[in-house]
């Protein structure tokens, strides 16, 4: 085991340090806030040995603590409506996808596409995988490659994470617009809907009423289905509120990132 220094103290820079120092044929990314299974490395290697250049697999969420609120936060995180529109979050059959969590990469890929872009903050995976696809490589998904990610244990930490994710998506979309799918911007559209409805209130309440009814019914339905399919605890009644906070935080972050991205884009290309 070799411990390397990461002077810039950001994930993308740290991975670049590791890639430069690596002597093997493959690079395997393992994040903090995650847990890998016993055969995780072996199953990655098997897929690469079958001729693939990049691979990964499902990444269910887990919790560190077994208190009721943590369990409810996990349900919010797991819920398709609450988070996670990427293919790698769902257990599906073997296929090619646009992105994976904790991927294994043949080292030669980085000789062709370059290292990770250290300017893009929290969305280094999106940027990297976009350039991988752009250069003609495919990303292989296999159910056998299983790892877990720990859900943020408190509401504040979860909302901070969602805001930051949305912020960097909005910001980096000015430079890498094709690195993100339309689904990444759904919370942003939701926030725009709220702003538009509020602006229209002096003229009509129709838009605000329609938004509240549609969103309210949807979150209530999601909550009921979650309660039916899981062991009930009282904190589950907070799911509609938590979903709103998650969506609003993510969407607000995207809005702020998009606005700040105009000036950031100029600085990005100057460097």
Describe each model-derived feature in a short phrase.
Residues 27:
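Short aromatic/hydrophobic "clamp" motif used to bind/position activated sugar donors
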Residues 57-63, 73-96, 100-102, 111, ...:
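Short, flexible, basic/aromatic active-site loop/helix in glycosyltransferases
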């Amino acid at each position: 085991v070799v411990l390397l220094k990461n002077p810039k103290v950001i994930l993308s820079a740290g991975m670049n340090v590791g890639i430069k120092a690596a002597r093997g044929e493959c690079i395997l990314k393992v994040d903090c806030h995650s847990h890998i299974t016993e055969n995780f490395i072996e199953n990655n290697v098997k897929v690469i040995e079958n001729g693939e250049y990049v691979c990964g697999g499902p990444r269910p969420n887990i919790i560190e603590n077994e208190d009721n609120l943590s369990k409810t936060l996990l349900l919010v995180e797991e819920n398709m409506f609450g988070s996670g529109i990427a293919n790698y979050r769902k257990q599906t059959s073997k296929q090619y996808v646009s992105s994976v969590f904790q991927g294994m990469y043949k080292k030669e890929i980085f000789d062709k596409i370059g290292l990770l872009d250290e300017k893009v903050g929290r969305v280094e995976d999106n940027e990297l995988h976009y350039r991988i696809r752009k250069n003609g490589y495919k990303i292989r998904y296999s159910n056998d490659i299983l790892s877990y990610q720990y859900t943020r244990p408190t509401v504040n930490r979860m909302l901070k994470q969602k805001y930051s994710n949305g912020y960097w998506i909005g910001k980096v979309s000015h430079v890498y617009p094709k690195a993100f799918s339309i689904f990444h911007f759904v919370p942003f559209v939701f926030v725009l809907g709220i702003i538009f409805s509020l602006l229209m209130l002096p003229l009509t309440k129709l838009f605000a009423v329609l938004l509240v009814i549609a969103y309210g019914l949807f979150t209530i339905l999601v909550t009921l289905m979650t309660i039916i399919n899981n062991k009930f605890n009282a904190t589950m009644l907070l799911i509609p509120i938590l979903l709103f906070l998650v969506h609003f935080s993510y969407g607000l972050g995207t809005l702020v990132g998009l606005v700040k991205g105009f000036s950031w884009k100029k600085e990005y290309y100057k460097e």
